[in-house]
Design a protein with these regions (language model features):
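Positively charged n-region of N-terminal signal peptides that target proteins for export
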Residues: 1-5
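Disulfide-bonded cysteine motifs in exported proteins
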Residues: 9, 32-35, 243-244
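Secreted/luminal cysteine- and crosslink-motif detector
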Residues: 15, 38-41, 249-250
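Short, conserved sequence motifs used for protein processing/export or organelle targeting and
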Residues: 74-94, 107-254
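Ligand-binding face of N-terminal immunoglobulin V-set domains in extracellular IgSF glycoproteins
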Residues: 101
């Protein structure tokens, strides 16, 4: 995935410090969805329900490969399509579809099947290294501070990614399979920002909020930040080793 960084000024209208929950998540749920997919609204709704569980990091990743059906997804990133295909190639099954959920970077299931998602969570918790890595995230003085602990686990290298997220977005669909519907999306990932590489040692990554990339969205819509430490590389992602999530300040550009 290719990412472009844009520098801009921000003005915060919140407290200066916010800390991620101390409890480590039991799962990272990535939903690959599309506004042009008539099977997706049920999965989008389910993700909203799962998002109320504080032990889960839930992420909505809109893809763009259904845009040719008549409606251009307003939340899609081409990088999400690339990420989904990379997962499929890594698993060796080449199964790319919507709605698809990938649990902890390892197992995929139908995104609207709650029982299958819960089963996948239970299965992946026993895989070596999955979410065994303590990760904390703090917002302080206009910076995001991410600390990744040291480990002696078998999987002790990976990439550290920061995702600006919008908790809730409603969209009027004008064409395509979902035309004339008003659909709500939860925990919409707006961008993937690589903070750096992690190599098994305790390390802190810092980035000014003012230097986060600005995608096709208004900065004031960003109200959450997720961080994911994932084995492998972007073109061949592996199990998710650690993750954290925190509420983010509402901000506006100057």
């Amino acid at each position: 995935m290719n990412y472009r960084h844009v520098t801009f000024a921000v003005a915060f209208i919140c407290t200066s410090v916010a800390t991620a929950a101390s409890a480590e998540p039991r799962a990272v749920i990535e939903l690959f969805t599309s506004q042009g997919c008539s099977s997706c609204p049920a999965a989008d709704k389910l993700l909203g329900e799962l998002s109320s569980d504080p032990s889960l990091v839930t992420m909505s990743l809109a893809v763009d490969y259904w845009d040719y059906l008549g409606w251009k997804d307003t939340l899609a990133l081409h990088g999400h399509s690339d990420r989904q295909r990379a997962y499929a190639e890594g698993r060796g099954d080449r199964e790319v579809y919507t709605p698809q959920v990938v649990v902890n970077g390892t197992v995929h299931v139908l995104g609207s099947d709650k029982a299958a998602i819960e089963k996948a969570i239970a299965q992946t918790r026993h895989k070596p290294g999955v979410l065994a890595l303590p990760v904390t995230m703090t917002l302080r003085d206009g910076k995001v501070m991410v600390n990744v602990a040291a480990t002696q686990n078998e999987l002790r290298s990976g990439e550290v990614w920061l995702c600006p997220v919008t908790s809730k977005v409603s969209v009027e669909i004008g064409r395509g399979e979902n035309h004339d519907r008003n659909l709500t999306y939860h925990n919409v990932v707006r961008r993937w920002v690589k903070l750096g590489d992690w190599n098994g040692k305790s390390e802190t990554f810092s980035v000014p909020l003012a230097e986060l990339p600005k995608g096709e969205y208004s900065l004031k819509d960003i109200d959450r930040l997720d961080v994911v430490v994932q084995s492998g590389v972007a073109a061949k992602p592996g199990p998710i080793l650690g993750a954290a999530s925190t509420s983010c300040c509402t901000a506006s550009t100057n």
